[in-house]
Structure formats: structure tokens, C-alpha cells
Amino acid sequence: FQHIVVFPGGNWIPKLWSDKNYNIVMKSLLKKYNNIKFILVGSAKEKENYYRNLVNGIDEKLIIDLFGCNLTLTSAFMKKSDLFLGNDSGLMHLAVSNQLRVISLFGPTDDKIYGPYGESNVVIRTKENLDYFKSIHIDANKSYMNSIKTNTVIDVIEKLLK
């Protein structure tokens, strides 16, 4: 099996991509590849917020639930995984430190400053650039990540899985 670590959470709502989008990506990959398992990571609170939508329609045997686990265990699983998909977050940096290939989603934050370092890592940005985000009042209760399309993320993952 190839293991893809998925982190839908983060500490700021404006930079969170929808859990339903992650679910679409996961289900699409499972239609094309029969050797993928998903390792879901985050806090216990994030599990409450995202788990149901994340795993909707996915066989539980293909899910490894690490929500609420400590960083040591999460890090150990990352070391044995093939890919990380997630928002701009501390767990994204933990994945980088474990030499995991990272696909990180960015919107209102600067990927040149906060993005994953390393040649093999990929940043997918919203179509809105940083100047746009600097020019508006950011509502802390609203996601600004909706211009990232699931097909874009799927295409990037498929290139990295080859």
C-alpha cells in the first residue's frame, strides 16, 4: 500500500480547504489506485469537526485514524508514508522534517515564507494572490481556499505517485 497522510485542519479558518474537498480527492484516488490507504491526522477537536465528511463513502479499512494522537506517533507514521496533503500548518512542517513529499495548500498566507522547503514539495495556491489578500479585510470565520479545485490537487498527487 501507498500511504497518504491527510491533514484537513489548522489554526486559522481562512486558510482551511473544505473537508468535503479532501473527501472528493480521496475518493477519486481510490477509483484509480487500489493500493492507497489514508492516514488522517490532527487534534481530537479536528476529528470532531472533519472526520465524518472526510471518510464519507470510503471503506474504513483504507483509513488509519490518528486524530488526537501525539506528535511522536504522528511523526512515526509520517516516516513510513509516501505523501502528505494538507493546509499550511505545523503538521505540514512536521511532514517536511520527516522527509515526506508534501503537497500544501496556500491562500491568504505567504508560501515563500511559510511554505514547505525542499525541491520535491509542491505548493498549490489559490487563484487570488497575496496582494489581493493584503487588500481586503479577512474574515476570520470564513475560508478563502475555495478557488483551489479538487482536480488540480488530484492531478498533482497523481504525478507524484508515478
Ranges and model annotations:
Residues 1-13:
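Conserved donor-binding/catalytic core segment of Leloir-type glycosyltransferases
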Residues 66, 114, 145-148:
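Short clusters of hydrophobic/aromatic residues that line enzyme substrate/ligand-binding pockets
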Residues 98-126:
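Gly/Pro- and small hydrophobic-enriched strand-loop and loop-to-helix capping segments
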Residues 19-107:
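Donor-binding and catalytic core of enzymes assembling or modifying cell-surface/extracellular glycoconjugates
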Residues 13, 47, 111, 130:
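Flexible, glycine-rich phosphate/dinucleotide-binding loops
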Residues 1, 31, 35, 59, ...:
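Short, Lys/Arg-enriched, disordered terminal segments
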Residues 119-162:
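Leloir-type glycosyltransferase catalytic cores
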Residues 14-18:
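Glycine/threonine-rich flexible loop motifs
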